[in-house]
Regions:
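Nucleotide-sugar-dependent
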Residues: 225-266, 272-280
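A short acidic/histidine/glycine-rich donor-binding loop in glycosyltransferase catalytic cores
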Residues: 285-291
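A short, active-site helix/loop in glycosyltransferases that binds the activated sugar's phosphate group
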Residues: 105-108, 119-143
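N-terminal pre-catalytic "stem/leader" segment of glycosyltransferase-like enzymes
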Residues: 1-90, 273-278
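A charged, aromatic-enriched C-terminal amphipathic alpha-helix characteristic of glycosyltransferases
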Residues: 292-299, 305-340
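Alpha-helix capping/helix-boundary segments
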Residues: 76, 129-131, 270, 277-278, ...
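Membrane-proximal helix-turn-helix segments that form the acceptor-binding/catalytic region
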Residues: 57-64, 85-89, 104-123
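Conserved catalytic-core segment of nucleotide-activated headgroup transferases in glycan assembly
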Residues: 152-229
Length: 340
């Protein structure tokens, strides 16, 4: 039997929780059985803890020899316990990684993280670069890749009229100087296009070239898919416009940012850092532009023909359809079960 462990998610507005609940829905559609309690969204810390704990304690009693149990990582303090209980029951554990605590948050050392992950039988990493990092640091489990996060939504992108220059660029996410200081510098290099910003915390008076910014405020993801204003979606993190720096920026070399999937569902070709792990996916599928620095973006957009853009947009719509159907999670789980 194919199983998964649901839990409490503190609301569904964050990208991380959206990715996890989407994967639960895909597994449910594949007739996987939830061995935990019913999914809940309590924001109260005590209720969240109690419901997740109750589901964790229930799970081992529902597992049998030969079962496959899918866990979404991190599961924090419960992860090793659930893996050990599953193995005692004769089940195999498949892990889908969402976040590595030894990178951005430094919640674990690399050694602690690998030791924890080695309780799994099979790990689905975000991409080939994350897979290699796990191998290089001593991960003993079998490894596969996701490719990109799926993005479920009943909403569809609104068809746009033919796009004309100058192109506009959309950025969605945390907009404060602490998280993404590059937003306050990039205006220096913007002359002929606009940046449309979606999210909270943008301090427009601190931004250079502020006349090129349109601050749209926070918009729910389903609404953004239907109403996104822009021609490209920007994937960039850190303090610098020249490269992606800091813990958040450097993590792009291994991580699949969930916002990339949101942009694709909006039918927006992607602009992404050339060294980002997802840059390979963007190049291989012809769904955007990979840049070394945002300083060169003005020139690149000015030289991109409307025909080239139309082809990118067509390819982006095709990938977006796959994301809406859970294609990548389905494929990764099927491969995991076949290899175990």
């Amino acid at each position: 039997m194919n199983c998964y462990l649901s839990r409490n998610y503190k609301g569904l507005s964050s990208a991380g929780n959206k990715a996890k609940t989407d994967i639960e829905q895909i597994m449910k559609d594949l007739s996987f059985k939830n061995v935990g309690l019913k999914q809940t969204t309590y924001r109260n810390k005590v209720l969240s803890f109690l419901f997740t704990l109750a589901g964790v304690l229930k799970a081992p009693f529902c597992l049998h020899k030969g079962d496959y149990l899918v866990l979404q990582y991190p599961l924090k303090k419960y992860f090793s316990f659930v893996c050990n209980m599953a193995h005692q029951k004769g089940a195999k554990v498949i892990v889908i990684i969402h976040d590595l605590g030894s990178f951005r948050r430094k919640a674990l050392t690399i050694e602690q993280e690998i030791s924890r992950l080695n309780h799994a039988d099979y790990i689905i990493a975000h991409n080939e670069k994350m897979k290699k990092w796990l191998e290089d640091n001593g991960c003993k489990a079998k490894l596969g890749i996701l490719g990109i996060f799926d993005y479920l939504s009943a909403t569809s992108a609104t068809p746009k009229q033919d796009t004309e220059k100058p192109y506009s660029v959309l950025y969605a996410g945390a907009l404060s100087p602490r998280k993404n200081a590059f937003l306050y510098e990039v205006g220096t290099f913007v002359h002929s296009f606009n940046l449309n910003l979606y999210g909270n915390g943008f301090e427009i008076n601190q931004a250079k070239g502020k006349e090129h910014f349109n601050y749209m405020g926070f918009v729910k993801s389903d609404d953004l898919i239907a109403t996104a204003q822009g021609d490209f979606g920007l994937v960039w993190d850190g303090t610098s416009v020249s490269t992606c720096t800091g813990d958040f920026g450097e993590y792009l070399q291994y991580n699949n940012p969930h916002k990339t999937s949101l942009y694709i569902r909006c039918q927006l070709p992607v602009i992404i850092w050339n060294k980002a792990a997802l840059a390979d996916f963007v190049r291989e599928n012809g769904i955007g532009i990979c840049v070394d620095s945002l300083e060169e973006l003005e020139k690149i957009l000015n030289t991109l023909s409307e025909e080239e853009y139309a082809e990118m947009k067509k390819r982006t719509a095709k990938i977006g359809e796959q994301l809406s159907q859970g294609h990548f999670v389905r494929k990764a789980l099927q491969e995991a079960i076949e290899r175990l």
